[in-house]
Amino acid sequence: MSERVPAIKVLLLPKDTNALGTIFGGVILSHIDLASAVEARKVAPRRYVTKAMREVEFHEPVFLGDVVNFFTETVRVGRTSITVRVSVESERWGSGQGERVKVTEAEVVLVAVGDDGRPVPIKEGKG
């Protein structure tokens, strides 16, 4: 059985923290957006914009120094949109063990757009 490969992997830094000293949720959302775009481009090499983030759930905090993995899975491909599920796992290196913990999950809807920014069919032509 092959091990899952993250769409993106990020080491979070002091600039990413909130007033509590954990990683700001908006930073995680930004990386979820990027990871979903990477997945969508693997499915069909187009230009995409984010239409919606659904069912975002923060399970655990992300700590300074965590290595954060963003795993993606295509859920649905429509005429002009792709829905991607993103599962976020932190590798906890503060204790020196590298324990992996599920911290966040979300579903992202991306729409393929042409040069004019209007929706275009995913399966036709280039973006």
Question: PLM features: residue spans?
Answer:
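Short, charge-patterned binding micro-sites
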Residues: 53-61
